[in-house]
Amino acid sequence: MKQSVKKPPPPGDTTVRGELPNGKLEEAPPPVLPPPPRPMADKDTSNESSSGSATQNTKERPPTELSTTEATTPATPAPPLQPRTLNPASKWSKIQIVTKQTGNECVTAIEIVPATPAGMRPAANV
């Protein structure tokens, strides 16, 4: 009488449907790959701020358009605007943001506005 010797299936072989643990065929989940590195073109190399210009003169700029959801549902009502008063003992300086174009490059600089005596200052720029 000849005995049949059962060979174990090779590892990872799912085509053999012999004895299965717990009666279920288990499949390994797909491996999780790390995200690909960012291309160099997307990298921020400039010193620009995402907040934009912080100038006080808003009369020269056209009003920005709000999306329909922002225009119909205001978050909180804005308090009435009051003129600012400057403290003469303050160490802060007034600045101006200037952008100049040379060729195909733009250069943005912050210039310190020279201090003027309080009597010489126009009221609209305070």
Curated annotation (Swiss-Prot):
Residues 1-90 are annotated as: Disordered. The keyword Transport does not apply. Residues 64-75 have a biased composition (Low complexity). It is a multi-pass membrane protein. Residues 47-57 have a biased composition (Polar residues). The muscarinic acetylcholine receptor mediates various cellular responses, including inhibition of adenylate cyclase, breakdown of phosphoinositides and modulation of potassium channels through the action of G proteins. Primary transducing effect is inhibition of adenylate cyclase. May couple to multiple functional responses in cell lines. This is Muscarinic acetylcholine receptor M4. It comes from Bos taurus (Bovine).
